[in-house]
Amino acid sequence: MGGDNTLNDFRHIPRKRFGQHWLKDQGVLDQIVKAAELNPEDCVLEVGPGKGALTEKLIESQARFIQAIELDRDLVVGLKKRFSHQNKFSLREGDILSAPLDAENGLTINKVVANIPYNITGPLLKRLIGELRKAPDNCFETLVLLMQKEVAQRLLARPGTSNFSALSVRIQLLAKCQDVCDVPSKCFQPAPKVDSKVVMIKPFASIDPDFYEVGNLLEKLLKHAFAGRRKKLRNTIGSFVTSNDQIKEFFAYRGISLDQRPQEISPSNWFGLAKALKETCVIENGTFQSK
């Protein structure tokens, strides 16, 4: 069930344009389901079920209902045939970046499980978790995502480490991320060129009322600062800090130094800086100017 034999019996040549790499390792499949902490009230969205190895595990779990979305039409045919007898499973053909994310039986989806194609990781994270400037269309309580290890390390990175980036700031302001397990390339069929990692993401139930109001400014601030991640803050945003008393007070209060680099600043401090900037600065021609 869901292992090597199942994958081989389901005849389908992987398509590179869809980024198809099917997880075959039973241990990893079990860890994904365990991390989702499924109970009889849960309605799960599975992204890209492929040949159904993880789908079968989800159906066997305590989850109330599984709604899957698959883009590959040939796989859709095979999946419908394989799981046609399952009344707690429904399959929608479509692109996860644009398809409806609700369950076809009217239930509210509260959890997501996905083996993310590497080529759509960024856009999919935005759709499922939201953006600094825009709340997500659907609010999920837990997401268990299998993704490229390099990207996962950035989601999990702490300030001051080499992997901490603008993506780290964005995601950590929106959700709590937890490492589940590493997934070597040999766990897939066909094996990708890079390793993967499973991450559990729990979006915050409540967001600061000012969050989305300053989100656009925060995005521009992060882009501006992390474009020169090896540069000290005084060389990227120092000009408007030293000329703005309110921003200087914020730096002093939070213990931030212009000799620090962008990856050394915590997500909460980046948000606080954006709030202070919104009151005192505007962006003109890509640079920050005092009002």
From Swiss-Prot:
Source species taxonomy: Bacteria, Bacillati, Cyanobacteriota, Cyanophyceae, Synechococcales
PROSITE patterns: RRNA_A_DIMETH (PS01131), SAM_RNA_A_N6_MT (PS51689)
UniProt EC number: 2.1.1.182
Protein name in the entry: Ribosomal RNA small subunit methyltransferase A
Transmembrane portions of the chain: none
Gene it is expressed from: rsmA
SMART domains in the cross-refs: rADc
Catalytic activity as recorded in UniProt: adenosine(1518)/adenosine(1519) in 16S rRNA + 4 S-adenosyl-L-methionine = N(6)-dimethyladenosine(1518)/N(6)-dimethyladenosine(1519) in 16S rRNA + 4 S-adenosyl-L-homocysteine + 4 H(+)
Organism annotation: Prochlorococcus marinus (strain NATL2A)
A Pfam short name: RrnaAD
Keyword field: Cytoplasm, Methyltransferase, RNA-binding, rRNA processing, S-adenosyl-L-methionine, Transferase
Subcellular location: Cytoplasm
Residues holding S-adenosyl-L-methionine: H21, L23, G48, E70, D95, N115
UniProt xrefs under InterPro entries: KsgA/Erm, rRNA_Ade_diMease-like_C, rRNA_Ade_Mease_Trfase_CS, rRNA_Ade_methylase_Trfase_N, rRNA_adenine_dimethylase, SAM-dependent_MTases_sf
MF GO annotations: 16S rRNA (adenine(1518)-N(6)/adenine(1519)-N(6))-dimethyltransferase activity; RNA binding
